[in-house]
């Protein structure tokens, strides 16, 4: 019987021999494998890593015990354990030994802080007694410094540019107490730990347990620090994964998904990020991440570690076999990669393209494709194929300089580069030539800015933008002032249905299972529903089982079960009081750094099995907003600064999830790049930047991975709330990109329900306002056909779930 699991909550184990898959050994091992695949070796002078067998280690830093598996909020996961770096190293006693004096000191200190209510990752770095430092040096000549960071949903990372603007979140205020200049930089206490270690030990390794970009200048050019492993936030087995790589059980193969600059102010977005709670001006326009650092004059000197960078314990060479271009612009590049070193390893080949300088400003390079090799033994080779498209080098003309509202391929030569980072590339002999400027894709204007005063150009200067009259996002919009007052006067209806019949007629109702069986069409089924039932279905439904993020459907008189939703981006999130522990997967930034869609697909499929096993139907992941600035508190939950890399990695997550008949939910649509005042902050952006950077991730995923659900964001986009934005939800998402699934709001938005439905938002979460919809329907401000359309989209997704 279809939906038996959802209807009767049997918690049927999905593993072999009646075993549960949730937090199973197979899943925690996969989590560790994925973590190892995305950790990035930033520095390794004199091949200090991997440690030789028998190496003695003095491990410094509270992060050795205060392990941060992931970020806070929807990205947090209830687990039965986490493996710290200290525990991970001790488990490898055949490879290394850890000085117990330091281990006991840090474990006790962290445990004491936890007992005082300090959150993981927010503990204070303790002062190391001089005598303990002396004993550690007597034990070994090799030190390992650990640093960790924690951030979360609802609050942004602190910086010296806060200008007194507070997020109001307790964790934000706690962070300010710990980090004097913001958590991008080392705290004073961390510096007091690092300096004596460098002065005392001839061999020093650093491990970073962080969720986003941090200062790297303190170790990058310091000869006293020989090796650095960016271990990110590695999930439930993250400490074990890092320990294994340090000991040579595997070779680091991660590549950076973001550019590491010298200082925070080197990121153009940092100056105005904390300027106001009310708005964010995207004045950097299309020059985000490496597009800025590789294009703007002088910006290249600000880079410490470039996009795509990452070392290995071995070396590789590659030879170009051939390049082919199809009529539709598809490029196929074949490369032979050989492991030329003495250690096994994987390499990532990256294909970049460059458009000619023309009338429209352009970045100097953009990523077109990439491919990761299999695990290559010394001397082994592999033929690798990269597939991209020259039309991805087109520029969107939002001002009509060449051709209004169109992607344009300007006249001239297009060059291509192959390498293992955006900096370390070789130009291919192949050149694509446009004899004359042509329109690659004609579109229509969407999301024109109303308040953005200027935007950056390729030479680093700024141009003024024509803007439309500003718009109050809470103005009457579709309603007159009087009508708005009437509807706004209705209190939100959060009295969820408990199964009472909304239908007063005694005749037999068509059942939803008949639609699934094919004996009744979806049109026929929806046509029988009353206005009240339609309004009921367009809102979230009460929690059942272990869920805490509410559900969809729940119309028992017509056989529609209550389909539960659940967070989140780092694993199935179930509240601790429910007593169910799940697998914490590595954070999204780490998954992006794997540059390996196949392993992300495996993580998605495994996570979806845990979702199914716990009677959840809709998984609220992946989150795919762009890393515009290191300061966004939710960057750990997002993937990268590059829209192509995000789309390919997160798209694999979507495909993996939906292979298990669980609905993936791509979020937050769109331009949700700041957590402070996220429900009322206006993202002011040009149409070109929106299309080429911030919406391109969603567009590619919609077209290639075909997600069943999308979540609109809290924020305002160019003066219109995202959840009420017809340009976003209808013109772009459905009319241009062909999205056929359901759009839900983020939880408890400030948007008005009838305006959201009219804009294309199908379900208001966590609860709807049926009275608002019915009054709008009565006044002619909302059509029944519009409600039916949203309900059909919702039920269409529920039909796919099993």
Predicted features, each with a name:
Residues 1-424, 443-802:
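Glycoside hydrolase catalytic-domain context in secreted enzymes
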Residues 424-444:
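Short beta-strand elements
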